From Swiss-Prot:
Modified residues (N6-succinyllysine): 57, 66, 338
Biological or metabolic pathway of the protein: Carbohydrate metabolism; tricarboxylic acid cycle; succinate from succinyl-CoA (ligase route): step 1/1
Principal location listed in the UniProt entry: mitochondrion
One function term, GO molecular function aspect: nucleotide binding
Entry protein name: Succinate--CoA ligase [ADP/GDP-forming] subunit alpha, mitochondrial
Keywords: Acetylation, Ligase, Mitochondrion, Nucleotide-binding, Transit peptide, Tricarboxylic acid cycle
Species classification: Eukaryota, Metazoa, Chordata, Craniata, Vertebrata
């Protein structure tokens, strides 16, 4: 039983009567899809939207709120092509010199937006994601932490049955192509255009890997924070496919943690798609090696339950796929550098 299953009873009790039964059924279906690593073909096709660059047109949902304002200003200063935002009831006004719209559909039609970032409080975040799906925004990045898992089960159920919109998050730092496009809350100044693709369940450990790869002179090609919740829109395998097919990405850092089976699925994916003489070096760190079973460690998805989801099992799976696993997050940069040295890639 993984974090998803642990979340199921709690989420199901949040509703009563027929709505509770419906939510329980959705939970069961989404859990099985996630457990078996299944992605509907249509949703898998949306992986291509994960790659952002200077041409990505971004809107912000929750644009005029405190968080939306602060991080939109940061994005503009970084050079992100932010083209507007939405706040219901404030359409027609301007904010930070950009137009405000009442709906995502209107914002997309008027600006040609290809991505949306969500800074909306937890009770309303799922509705914001659904609004972006309705508007067929290609990439949606939800930063919000604390969204009820029952809400996210419904969102995930819907996501897997369409192929127009790709979701990153929730409860994540976002995505960044250094020097080109920053969507989220990550500190832009530590990033440097380079050769390493980084994908992580942990926001702060992402920044650690970024800083280290910058320090050793390798830099980053694309960094994706997939978030630490049990029901998210993008997992390791989605990002790994992008990294393996991206000529600018020459090495990969994967940062996982206890709970769920995303790391094990990533290991299987790497066995199938990253072997042979042209394979790319992959370095990993798994947080929670000393975590006690049954206790949630920070993220909603970071819990060892039913004897599964432990760090040791994840490390073994990754090593069997040829991944070099660092025992310390402080050594990610030097470890990937040494792998480049071994392969004469410097």
């Amino acid at each position: 039983m993984t974090a998803a299953l642990v979340a199921a009873p709690a989420a199901a009790t949040m509703a009563s009567g027929s709505s509770g039964l419906a939510a329980a059924r959705l939970l069961s279906r989404s859990f099985l899809l996630q457990q078996n690593g299944i992605r509907h073909c249509s949703y898998t096709a949306s992986r291509k939207h994960l790659y952002v660059d200077k041409n990505t047109k971004v809107i912000c949902q929750g644009f005029t709120g405190k968080q939306g304002t602060f991080h939109s200003q940061q994005a503009l200063e970084y050079g992100t092509n932010l083209v507007g935002g939405t706040t219901p009831g404030k359409g027609g006004k301007t904010h930070l010199g950009l137009p405000v719209f009442n709906t995502v559909k209107e914002a997309k039609e008027q600006t040609g937006a290809t991505a949306s970032v969500i800074y909306v409080p937890p009770p309303f975040a799922a509705a914001a994601i659904n609004e972006a799906i309705d508007a067929e925004v290609p990439l949606v990045v939800c930063i919000t932490e604390g969204i009820p898992q029952q809400d996210m089960v419904r969102v995930k159920h819907r996501l897997l049955r369409q192929g127009k919109t790709r979701l990153i998050g929730p409860n994540c730092p976002g995505v960044i192509n250094p020097g080109e496009c920053k969507i989220g809350i990550m500190p832009g100044h530590i990033h440097k255009k380079g050769r390493i693709g980084i994908v992580s369940r942990s926001g702060t450990l992402t920044y650690e890997a970024v800083h280290q790869t910058t320090q050793v002179g390798l830099g980053q090609s694309l960094c994706v924070g997939i978030g630490g919740d049990p029901f998210n829109g993008t997992d390791f395998t989605d990002c790994l496919e992008i990294f393996l097919n991206d000529p600018a990405t020459e090495g990969i850092i994967l940062i996982g943690e206890i709970g769920g089976n995303a790391e094990e699925n990533a290991a299987e994916f790497l066995k199938q798609h990253n072997s042979g003489p042209k394979s790319k070096p992959v370095v990993s760190f798994i947080a929670g090696l000393t975590a006690p079973p049954g206790r949630r460690m920070g993220h909603a998805g970071a819990i060892i339950a039913g004897g599964k989801g432990g760090a040791k099992e994840k490390i073994t799976a990754l090593q069997s796929a040829g991944v070099v696993v660092s025992m310390s997050p402080a050594q990610l940069g030097t470890t990937i550098y040494k792998e480049f040295e071994k392969r004469k890639m410097l």
